[in-house]
Amino acid sequence: MTVLLLIAAVVVGYLAVMSILTPEQFSKTRIAREAPIQVRLKEVAHVEKAFHDVYNRYAPVEELRQFLTDGRVFYVRSEGDYTDAMREAGINEREAAAKGLITRDTVWVSARDSLLKGGMTPEEFLQVPGFPQSIIEIDTASVAQEIGEDVVMVPVFRTAVPLSVYLADQDHKLLNTAIRDAEARYQGTGYPGLALGSLKEVKNTGNWE
C-alpha cells in the first residue's frame, strides 16, 4: 500500500509539474517559431507591392512565384531637383524633364535580382520558414471603396500561415485552444494563425501588430 501511495504521489506530482511546463513550453515554442514567419510575411507583402506597382493588382501564390522567376520591376532614376524656381516659372516636372533641366528615366530590372536576397529562389521564398514542406498562403480579392461620389473596386490581398502548420507537433489540446481563441477575435472573424493584410478591407499590417 505504501508503495502504491508513493507511486500515486509521484504521478500526481509529475502531472502537476507538466500542467505548468507544457503551456509554458508551448508559448515559448510559438513565440520562437512565429518570429521568422512574421518577417517573411512582411517580405511577401513587399513583393506584392512591387507586383501591384507593375500590374495594379495583387498576385496569388503561383503568379507571384512566376513574377519572382522571370518578372520585372521598375524604378525611376532621378538626376537633378525640381526646384521652387521652376515651379514659380510655371514649369511642371514633366516640362522640366523635357527641357533637360532634370532627368527622370524609368529603369526596368529583374524582379528576382531586385527582390530576393542571398541567392534565395522563388520556391524557397514562398516556403514557411522552418517548415519547407508547407507553402505560405496568399489570397486576393477586391473590395468596394468610396472615392468622392464614386465607388471603385480596390484590389486587396492576405498572406498567412495557419497555427496548424507551425505548431502541429505541439500539445494538441493547447493547439486547439489557441486556434479557437484566434478564431474568436474580431467578433468571430479572426484568422487561426499569422496573417498580414485582409480580404475585406484595405490593410497592410499583420494580425500580431
What is the meaning of each model-derived region?
Residues 6, 27, 50:
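Residue-level detector of functional hotspots within protein domains
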Residues 53-209:
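Low-complexity, acidic interaction segments enriched in glycine
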Residues 34-55:
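N-terminal alpha-helical signal peptides/signal-anchor transmembrane segments
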Residues 3, 26, 83-87:
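Generic ordered-secondary-structure signal
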Residues 1-2, 12, 31-36, 41:
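Compact recognition or signaling/catalytic modules
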Residues 1-19:
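Hydrophobic membrane-insertion alpha-helices, especially the h-region
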